[in-house]
Amino acid sequence: MAKDIKFSADARESMVRGVDILADTVKVTLGPKGRNVVLEKAFGSPLITNDGVTIAKEIELEDHFENMGAKLVSEVASKTNDIAGDGTTTATVLTQAIVREGLKNVTAGANPIGIRRGIEAATTTAVEALKAVAQPVSGKEAIAQVASVSSRSEKVGDYISEAMERVGNDGVITIEESRGMETELEVVEGMQFDRGYLSQYMVTDNEKMVADLENPFILITDKKISNIQDILPLLEEVLKTSRPLLIIADDVDGEALPTLVLNKIRGTFNVVAVKAPGFGDRRKAMLEDIAVLTGGTVITEDLGLELKDATMAALGQAAKVTVDKDNTVIVEGAGSSEAISNRVSLIKSQLETTTSEFDREKLQERLAKLAGGVAVIKVGAATETELKEMKLRIEDALNATRAAVEEGIVAGGGTALINVMDKVAALELDGDAATGRNIVLRALEEPVRQIAYNAGYEGSVIIDKLKNSAAGVGFNAATGEWVDMIATGIIDPVKVTRSALQNAASVAGLILTTEAVVATKPEPAAPAMPQGMDPGMMGGF
């Protein structure tokens, strides 16, 4: 396949046109007065959103060289979203500013490598300065503030802060679509997995069709139970205690299931059987999680254990277990806090090393089920379009809040970036590296400039006054007032701000040091069949 190649200034300028098209589309959404962008969808109604990464992912340009520039900026937004969950528009604005200023200097004869070195040094200094002024976030009110700023809704802020308070910082908070118009919060305490009872005759509440087990023993195994004789000695021991039993196994079939059901119906003992959650290696890991949580042992051939030899000591325990046709919830497992803490640490270390997004998601779920619980924010809205937009805003707010709890907060609205300019300006560099530093200094102003512009103010006037104000005092674009940003609740998570700057500087440096761009030439369209020609003449049928 033939390739099209451009060199030097021609190559960079083509890519920068793509950068500008994407950035100009995304940056209109920045700030409290940011506008929306309407995205056409192949199916269904258009999507109206102000989420930077969602917009960036949708943009595909006809010119291959321009498209490469656009895709590099889209990568900045995606990377920032992956790391911090928010700040994608800020990252896009910073990238455009660094690229635009950098290109002017490279065109004027500056060495791109020297400029890149200066950009990297200035970015490192700015990030260190941001971390130095960060304030920790703790308490329900502070968390609600962060979420409210990100989502532009106090109500959403309250939902997220309550969810984090209920399930902890390591808990899973999922966002689902509600069937009604109201947004609501639902919290599931304890460990929940998506496996229900194997027989409806095991229920204890016929009206709700659920099985409630108070203070049960829990048998955990990765084996299939087909012969009741395999677990008969254990059942007899449990029967003596008059306590219910939950069986978690690969499957319960053959004569074993009807025997258990029959004894349940007769009232001999209260037993519920469910299939083990997950598949393959993940199933083994999840069974081990349940064992740690309940203080039991997984009966598995991997450890040389057999069901017929199992004793009461191998059984886990919990304060309560609730099983319906789809889910099982274990509340207040009897496992030791030390064992649970060690298991949590192990999962966290696996989270740090995994490169798979799917594995990361599953590990995060396992961590939440052990460490906290699961909260579900059910988003309601009048129309499907509003629902999609609201869901994206809540996802951003949740990610920003987690980032704030993790690394702290700084003054929002781009104020923190202006406040660290003195530290960057004091960086002693010379030649083209000094030019790179000055490019970053100019770029640090850009988020404030764009926020002001979107709110109908002159950015240069706002920036000039901001530079002469006390640290932390900034411009509230929503009201047009000058306020103490943190005290007013206008804050940005450090993780979001630094990730946006680091990713922007990284990709902008790559674009500026690009000397050749190779793109695939579009293939010429196949010639159309002459009108009136019979397909049968060409061997058609």
From Swiss-Prot:
InterPro entries: Chaperonin_Cpn60_CS, Cpn60/GroEL, Cpn60/GroEL/TCP-1, GroEL-like_apical_dom_sf, GROEL-like_equatorial_sf, TCP-1-like_intermed_sf
The reaction(s) this protein catalyses: ATP + H2O + a folded polypeptide = ADP + phosphate + an unfolded polypeptide
TM ranges: none
Domain of life from the UniProt record: Bacteria
Compartments, record wording: Cytoplasm
EC code(s) of this entry: 5.6.1.7
CDD domains according to UniProt: GroEL
Any Gene Ontology CC annotation: cytoplasm
EC top class, as a word: isomerase
Alphabetized PANTHER family for the sequence: 60 KDA HEAT SHOCK PROTEIN, MITOCHONDRIAL
Protein name as annotated: Chaperonin GroEL
Organism: Streptococcus equi subsp. zooepidemicus (strain MGCS10565)
